[in-house]
Amino acid sequence: MASTPEGIVKDKVKKVLAKYGDELDALWVVPSGMGSPTLDCIICYRGHHIEVETKAPGKLPTPRQLITMEKKEKAGAKVFVIDGDIGCARLDDYLAGIKAGLVEKR
């Protein structure tokens, strides 16, 4: 059980991802200050590359995170910033669209 506001959001995202079973692979990154900057969660689902940055409700990405997001999007990833239920619903809708064949690969 999460004890921080951002941790609560991460738990909500994990519940969304769990709905998609074995076809979805999610790597939750634990930053150590080494290597290249990355976002909180790297997802592969039916050949789609998705990345998620979770934030405490109302918080925004840092300038460094914005640079990382731009880099990921240029490389073809779909990026979500999620700070609560609305962001989780958007991610769920996107994944459901992939499952239904409505979302083309980037």
Sequence positions of predicted segments:
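Catalytic phosphate/metal-binding cores of nucleic-acid and nucleotide-processing enzymes, i.e., regions
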Residues: 1-106
